[in-house]
Amino acid sequence: MADELTYALITPYSLLKSRTGGILGRLLSLTNLEIVGATMFAPSDAFVDKYCATLEEQVTKPAWKKVMMNYVNSNFRKENKFRITNRMLLLFFRGDQAIAKLKDDVIGPITSFQGHTIRGSFGDYVERSDGTVEYFEPAALTSADPVTNNKQLALFAEYMTKDGGVIEDVVKFPEGTKPETTLVILKPFEERSPLPGNIIDMFSRTGLYIVGIKLLRMSIAQADEFYGPLVDIFREKLKPKPEKIAEKLREGFKATFSFEVPAAIVNNHSEQLSEQLKDMNARHEFNKIIQYMTGLDPEKASQADKAKPGTARCLALLYRGPDAILKIRNILGPTNSKQGEPGKIRRIYGEDIMKNAAHASDAVENAERERKIISLWDNKGRCELKELIENYLQKSR
């Protein structure tokens, strides 16, 4: 059977209650589907009307159809019953029988009370004694069948550039508040790992709003530009220490000559080598980061290959709110994960100074520079998710 492309839409109320990380962790870990895209989505009334029309047309129990349509109409619009932002997190998955697996095995039925599904853990369904619905919160939505799936995918493609992408202006703050937007990149994660969800759950303690998200396969060219400032830092910070070079020289001289080489000669050459090798060492350490973040060896890649997406998967997020940069970096912890306080993200999930769970911008101007490099600055230009959907639908005809 051919692979199917489908979606999961995390609801505005789930984002409001900071359930995003828990739901995302389930979506990533409870199925063998491949995540192929992610974006934020704040639907217009026009989208909501058309989405409800797809629900009306699908074949399912009339009572459940009515419940879902009422929910979407009441909660997805900019003016909604909870008077909250209608931010949603939209994820795309691909794989064999993706539609059924996501709907039945991961998200679960409307009335699910079992904790092994998303709705069982994060959703609510309360009936009155007469069988009518008193309260319903599905936590996440997905398509019910292949026909409805294709209709809804086409709808997302149509409105992707209008209602999706970077949605900084959707969140409103009290007058006088000066919000910042900072970039976070969750570093390469394995398939079926709940790690990105776990980290997002910890970031939720900041009280900041997610206003952008992107599944990132960083190219070597992007990584080289993104981390470029580190080369100058590494040149001096990681410069080979003369005393260590001297130690190696003495060992080599001792094994080669039957006489002792004067200390003045050893020390003189050690100082020279330290200066001569600092550029080479800085680039070598820099390339380790590039390979880790892209999954590709920059020393072996051709110029053409350096522009292609890497094999390593990262998740880039935009957090917005007052003092966003400080709040994110505080809960993240220091670059060296072993030096962080207990309870910090890098202390819990980091391995070393490079594999330290996540990157976070250290200043507003750097956040702007970094966002532009990975195309998470605005909604202009090419829309990869729209192309992904359109290519799939064309092949499905």
Spans of features found by a protein language model:
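Non-catalytic terminal and connector segments of soluble metabolic enzymes
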Residues: 1-397
